[in-house]
Amino acid sequence: TFEIIVVMNGCRDDTREVVEQAAAGNRAVRIIEFTQPLGKGGAIWEGLAVANGNRLAFVDADNMVRAPEAEKLIRALDSHDVAIADRFAGVEEGGTSQPPLRKLISRASRLWVRMFLGLPYADTQCGAKAFRIAAWRRIAPRVLERQADNAQ
């Protein structure tokens, strides 16, 4: 079983209606609403704090990571404690492409992370990550809450 938690973070558009319509009759979908913006990191923390289960994942709602890629992310937890999606994977198969300047900045950031931090990961800035609950419990106390949430 699974649950989907949608954190409404000071939204001023029709996001709630879109989510309610898409989730109509699906008891696995839960909406948590905050009238004051928490910021992206705050929304992630609030969603993870109320999540149930032995696997946790979050995906930004900007459509950069499509459902098939999100499924791969979850399946990666079969053999890994943590999984990070890649915004550039799947773009050819219908994912959302970034504007040229944003793409350049994203790729430069990826290069910086690899060169200067020595991390082997392809896309630490991707807004889609998954964790086994035991790994999350070890990692969470070390994360600077609501600060540079993607890079951590």
Model region roles, listed by residue range:
Residues 34-50, 55, 67-146:
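Acceptor/aglycone-binding surface of glycosyltransferases and processive sugar-polymer synthases
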Residues 148-152:
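Acidic donor-binding loop at a coil-to-helix junction in glycosyltransferase catalytic cores
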Residues 2-5, 16-50:
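Conserved donor nucleotide-binding strand/loop of the catalytic core
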Residues 8-17, 63:
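A conserved acidic beta->alpha catalytic loop
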Residues 6-8, 86-87:
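A general secondary-structure junction signal
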